Amino acid sequence: MLRPLPIALTLATLMTAPAAAQYRYEPAPANLAARAWFQDAKFGLFIHWGVYSLLQDGEWVMQNRGIRASEYETLAPEFNPTRFDAAEWVALAQAAGMRYITITSKHHDGFAMFDSQVSDWDIVERTPYRRDVIRMLAEECRRQGLRLFVYYSQLDWHHSDYFPRGQTGHATGRAESGDFGRYLDYMDGQLRELFTGYGELGGVWFDGMWDRPEADWRLERTYRMLHELQPAALVGSNHHRAPFPGEDFQMFEQDLPGANTAGFNTAAVSDLPLETAATINDSWGYHLGDRNFKSAAQVIGLLVNAAGRNANLLLNVGPMPTGEIQPEFRTRLHEVGAWLRRNGEAIYGTRGGPIAPRPWGVTTQKQDRVYVHVLSWQDPRLALPALPRRVRAATVLADGRRVAFQETADGVTLTLPPRAEGEVDQIVVLELAR
């Protein structure tokens, strides 16, 4: 994922458009159906895992410590995650109420977590583990009914043909020469492997184009290939721009759609399916020293706020080098899953509600039901703007209690019952007249 860049570089990224052919993209019917499924799913598990986990300092450790590529390669023989259990990971996602998983097939270090035939810089050929974790996860997701997306970094700190260098990767010791077109051929080769050898994928989550914003990334060629290989697979890119033709969803890193607290997300919110990608602590890859864990209430609030903005939440864990997911992450996921088992009706299958986000919370909607998510409000009376249709009834989702309300031409005023102790989100269900 992306770390803050110097201001001058960030401005250059924002002001320069990549040279990409603007082709006419008509999504297939299967793709449109997959988009609707994606919007219904609402919650996914993001996994950042690779040889960098050995250094216990996040996924950017190669860049942050200025590690040369030749030195970094010595990590691979030490990477032997014998405690990795694909069934356990997928079951954990299920228990959390997640409907899909997105895992790093290749991060910025260039190391493939699958058995690539176009490179030997991968988990099967360079590590004593010698197993294809992407294949194992793909098979287990099919068994347990989740969809698998693959994260793929366009940026590469290891490949010699990733040249000219971009904003990062200058201390890796690679020769100051290379053929970027040849690198893109290599990238397309690996993507073809993923899209032809691992069954039906949910889609691909690109990252790293921001490293060389002025480059011609041959998006049309790559996107056409992917859509031809798997028409239903969704293509998205974390480039922090307005979506390009061929992209099927728009993501926001460490922010809700329309916000830019992290400094990355300057693009307007599109009409494509949306996704917020966020961490449980402050790191994407495993970081032993990062103990700044979000509480269950914070994660639930993030999920609810995303849903109220018509977006999914892709919540990240960074597994340990052993293949285990640390206890703090597992605990948090189980807590969120318990909340969703009680309140999932107001999340799954919904879209952003008729009321724009407010300081007190958000609304979601499913057919004739509007779910009022009261996250932060002390007054027993809550005034809502006028709704598209008359309100027939108002009840508390948790226990079915009736909620008194008054409706006028100007709006609806709810009289909220006392909140239960520790209640993160008081959800009032409004039944609208048909």
Task: Locate each region found by the language model.
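Mature catalytic domains of secreted/periplasmic carbohydrate-active enzymes
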Residues: 22-434
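Sec/Tat signal peptide C-region and signal peptidase I cleavage site
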Residues: 17-21
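Positively charged n-region of N-terminal signal peptides that target proteins for export
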Residues: 1-4, 93
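Bacterial N-terminal signal peptides
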Residues: 6-16
